[in-house]
């Protein structure tokens, strides 16, 4: 996109998104760049932290001294399987629309072509892993059992072991890989492993893990622009299908080296704090992980292992500060499930809120209600997030590592250039016609 503005002599000035921002950065202030276009920018005096990536020795989140581990029975999906009337109707309405048993009324973007795409994308996850996606453990490719070599391979150093594991994980399909130390704070106290009985049992590992390998997978950008229509669901489903295959391969790799491995997707433990602990990204207003490279447009899986590994440090790159002033996801959320509060807090919204961490709490019940309306996992919040871009302007800030007052007004630029405003119908057409 190119902005066009006339100067005082009536001549047209053309400025691309990237050159516009680079001009602003070159002047040292976002306001200078905006002045080229004659705009006044709100919040320009609120200077954010450095835009570069900073490493930390401890978790960059405030955790309560009385933090209690989360029980999986409280996730909105497990509540539905357990018969919770508050969420069960919405859950089965969502499933019914997703499978086509309940007719869709969404119009373009919900046609047979898109249904076929969505079903195909989810096919490996659904046909091989069964009920894994809602959070059931030890199913399909995420099986906890596997032949372990009796001869443990000895790496010279934990650093070399981590290097080998990351190489294998990216070779097998992961886009990002980080390693966290085992921390039982993020592990569910109890789990439900049988979708038919929804029986709760203590979450016990068959060995003592020492580390967690966390992998992030990029979802397709073009199809995600169709959110909340079916191509967004296909983008997520394709990754769920690929994620199980990669997790299984990495677990097999570890077992053949003579070490134990438990591959997990949405089950067993909280993925987002593990992603933060492994240095993959920051916690956001949406409640999901934002990575420097792909923003929030990723899915996560993890593998618990007893292989000695060198761990990665948690990082920050300005997400928390930016989320305080942006609120674009909260404004766009049809069900208003995302907090509008400026500051994160320890308050909980529903029983599904994982407490004890200072954050913006998501209303999972309202979120599921939106899923029930559209018959997909929505994704509007990810679509509109200013960090959800291909290699474009927000990456310039990260790469340059410059101190600039522009970070608080990135949403202004994001809106100015029309990001996240493409309709589901138009995005669906664009996807098929490109």
PLM ranges: what are they?
Residues 139-150, 230-231:
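A short, surface-exposed helix-loop junction/capping segment
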Residues 16-39:
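N-terminal export leaders
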Residues 43-52:
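Ser/Thr/Pro/Gly-rich low-complexity linker/stalk segments immediately outside membranes or between
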Residues 399, 411-434:
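Long, compositionally biased charged/polar accessory segments in the mid-to-C-terminal portions
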Residues 389-413:
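C-terminal/domain-terminus segments
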Residues 64-134:
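Extended, charge-enriched "interface" segments that sit outside catalytic cores
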């Amino acid at each position: 996109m190119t902005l066009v503005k006339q100067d005082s002599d009536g001549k047209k000035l053309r400025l691309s998104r990237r050159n516009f921002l680079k001009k602003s950065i070159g002047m040292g202030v976002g306001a200078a760049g905006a002045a080229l276009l004659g705009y006044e920018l709100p919040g320009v005096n609120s200077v954010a932290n450095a835009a570069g990536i900073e490493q930390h020795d401890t978790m960059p989140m405030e955790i309560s001294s009385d933090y209690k581990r989360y029980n999986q029975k409280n996730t909105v999906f497990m509540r539905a399987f357990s018969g919770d009337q508050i969420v069960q109707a919405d859950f089965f309405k969502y499933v019914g629309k997703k499978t086509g048993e309940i007719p869709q009324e969404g119009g373009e973007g919900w046609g047979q072509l898109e249904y076929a795409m969505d079903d195909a994308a989810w096919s490996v996850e659904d046909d091989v892993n069964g009920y894994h996606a809602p959070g059931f453990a030890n199913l399909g490719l995420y099986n906890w059992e596997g032949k372990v070599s009796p001869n443990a391979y000895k790496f010279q150093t934990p650093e070399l072991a981590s290097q080998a594991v990351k190489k294998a994980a990216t070779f097998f399909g992961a886009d990002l890989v980080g390693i966290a130390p085992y921390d039982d704070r993020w592990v569910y106290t109890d789990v439900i492993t049988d979708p038919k009985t929804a029986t709760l049992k203590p979450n016990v590992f068959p060995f003592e893990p020492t580390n967690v390998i966390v992998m992030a997978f990029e979802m397709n950008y073009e199809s995600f622009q169709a959110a909340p229509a079916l191509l967004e669901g296909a983008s997520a489903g394709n990754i769920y299908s690929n994620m199980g295959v990669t997790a299984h391969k990495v677990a097999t790799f570890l077992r053949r080296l003579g070490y134990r491995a438990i591959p997990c997707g949405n089950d067993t433990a909280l993925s987002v704090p593990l992603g933060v602990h492994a240095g993959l990204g920051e916690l956001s207003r949406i409640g999901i992980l934002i990575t420097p490279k792909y923003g929030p447009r990723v899915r996560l899986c993890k593998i618990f292992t007893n292989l000695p590994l060198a761990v990665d440090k948690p990082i920050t790159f300005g997400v928390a500060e930016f989320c305080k002033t942006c609120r674009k996801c909260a404004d766009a959320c049809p069900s208003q499930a995302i907090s509008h509060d400026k500051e994160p807090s320890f308050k909980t919204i529903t029983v599904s809120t994982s407490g004890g961490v200072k954050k913006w709490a998501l209303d999972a019940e309202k979120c599921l209600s939106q899923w029930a309306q559209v018959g997909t996992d929505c994704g509007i919040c990810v679509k509109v997030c200013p960090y959800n871009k291909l290699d474009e302007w927000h990456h310039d800030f990260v790469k340059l590592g410059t101190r600039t007052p522009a970070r608080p007004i990135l949403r202004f630029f994001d809106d100015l250039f029309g990001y996240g405003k493409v309709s589901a119908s138009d995005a669906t057409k664009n996807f098929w016609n490109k």
